[in-house]
Amino acid sequence: MSRGSGGGYDRHITIFSPEGRLFQVEYAFKAVKAAGITSIGVRGKDSVCVVTQKKVPDKLLDQTSVSHLFPITKYLGLLATGMTADARTLVQQARNEAAEFRFKYGYEMPVDVLSKWIADKSQVYTQHAYMRPLGVVAMILGIDEEKGPQLFKCDPAGHFFGHKATSAGSKEQEAINFLEKKMKNDPAFSYEETVQTAISALQSVLQEDFKASEIEVGVVKKEDPIFRVLTTEEIDEHLTAISERD
């Protein structure tokens, strides 16, 4: 709907259109896709892996300073797809909330509790005229003491769901189609299979072979539940295993 025919419904975040749509929230989803990056998350039997593209827009940038993966606590990781500046403010607030939770209750914030907090925050941003929705889809990963590996996704509208596998970004639908086939029989992936499924899904939908420096991989394992970002050497090992398997 264009500005002229929108009747002002797309200018105000708090006003529904006659069709029952909130245009500003829809535009936030478009902003996520406009970033031109695709991210994938896969949950295995005893681990969770998230993979995203690493695009460095300027040759003079220090590559190590460009990242979409953020540790929230020692045990919880967040992968942000979309507007990185929006993600940073969300990450900072999430870190504060998780630290407060740890101080107040004496144990680490569970994955689903953090995901609900982020989703609640995003939902509030869709209600007030003086705010705008965040142009970010966040995947949160961690190991729950009772439920095991957990992968959640939160979007700009304030939805949050647990996933066996999911995707976000410009090729989201193609990735989901690929993952649905891979996860059809509810496989119990080992750690290596989880990482390699996520990387090969990204390779498949983007139809290109990556160098290790062109992707970022974040993992958590049940045996050692600390959130970790894989080094280029570790990513290289998985890329070699994938190419040998294919």
From Swiss-Prot:
Quaternary structure and partners: The 26S proteasome consists of a 20S proteasome core and two 19S regulatory subunits. The 20S proteasome core is composed of 28 subunits that are arranged in four stacked rings, resulting in a barrel-shaped structure. The two end rings are each formed by seven alpha subunits, and the two central rings are each formed by seven beta subunits. The catalytic chamber with the active sites is on the inside of the barrel.
Family note: Belongs to the peptidase T1A family.
Primary localization: cytoplasm
Keyword NADP: no
Alphabetical list of SMART domains matching this protein: Proteasome_A_N (SM00948)
GO BP: any one term: proteasome-mediated ubiquitin-dependent protein catabolic process
Localization annotation: Cytoplasm; Nucleus
InterPro entries: Ntn_hydrolases_N, Proteasome_alpha, Proteasome_alpha-type, Proteasome_asu_N, Proteasome_sua/b, Proteasome_subunit_alpha6
GO cellular component: cytoplasm; nucleus; proteasome core complex, alpha-subunit complex
Organism taxonomic ancestry: Eukaryota, Viridiplantae, Streptophyta, Embryophyta, Tracheophyta
Pfam entry (one): Proteasome_A_N
Origin: domain of life: Eukaryota
General function of this protein: The proteasome is a multicatalytic proteinase complex which is characterized by its ability to cleave peptides with Arg, Phe, Tyr, Leu, and Glu adjacent to the leaving group at neutral or slightly basic pH. The proteasome has an ATP-dependent proteolytic activity.
Key words of the record: Cytoplasm, Nucleus, Proteasome
Protein name: Proteasome subunit alpha type-6
